[in-house]
A protein has these predicted regions:
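Structured, amphipathic secondary-structure segments that form assembly/contact surfaces
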Residues: 1-12, 22-33, 40-59, 80-190
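Solvent-exposed, amphipathic alpha-helical segments
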Residues: 64-75
Length: 190
């Protein structure tokens, strides 16, 4: 009976040691998320562990800024698409950028022109103007009742700030954390 007791206490000590080891290992947090960048064909271009200090590249920022301009300056024929574009644009602005969008929307209400007018935006270039701003050039084609009414060339300087998303909602809406903080656009003449 004495041997059985020694074996039971030995198993109890072994079990306690293994439980302590599992607890220690679970607190280490060894799961590392990986980021896989793919091209338009679905082939892996870059594979690396995710970093909380990731800084987006200029082409990545340019893509999001081009989409921002298309969302704000374009005028589709569908009110739902227009609303979704504006809400998506607000996801890419700081408070100052949102105030600039509000001023633009108040003076040029896009919902008032909905119906007979559509505006197609074609981005021609997005280049870095300084460490905190990008210059975007685009062409707007305005259609009235389905007929081309005007073609205008526009440029903008967008000042940006890059902030790492801190919660799941911001990560889903703006994964790179690129925010427009100032907007200055104008029509080109000539």
């Amino acid at each position: 009976a004495r041997n059985w007791r020694l074996m039971a206490f030995g198993c109890l000590l072994l079990s306690g040691g293994l439980a302590a080891g599992l607890l220690w290992q679970s607190t280490k947090g060894t799961v590392t998320p990986w980021v896989v960048e793919i091209d338009h064909l679905g082939q892996a271009q870059a594979v690396a562990p995710a970093s909380p200090f990731y800084q987006p590249t200029d082409p990545q920022i340019a893509f999001h800024l081009a989409r921002f301009i298309e969302d704000v300056r374009g005028l589709p024929s569908d009110a739902i698409v227009l609303r979704q574009g504006w809400l998506r644009a607000y996801d890419f602005t700081t408070d100052r950028g949102a105030a600039a969008l509000n001023d633009y929307a108040r003076s040029n209400n896009p919902f008032a022109r909905l119906g007979n007018t559509q505006v197609a935006v074609e981005i021609s270039s997005v280049i870095r103007a300084s460490s905190e701003s990008f210059r975007i050039a685009w062409t707007e084609r305005r259609y009235d009742s389905g007929q081309l009414a005007a073609t205008e060339r526009w440029t903008a300087i967008l000042s940006i700030v890059v902030e790492t998303p801190r919660d799941a909602d911001r990560l889903r809406k703006n994964p790179l954390g690129v925010y427009v903080k100032a907007i200055n656009w104008s029509k080109e003449f000539g």
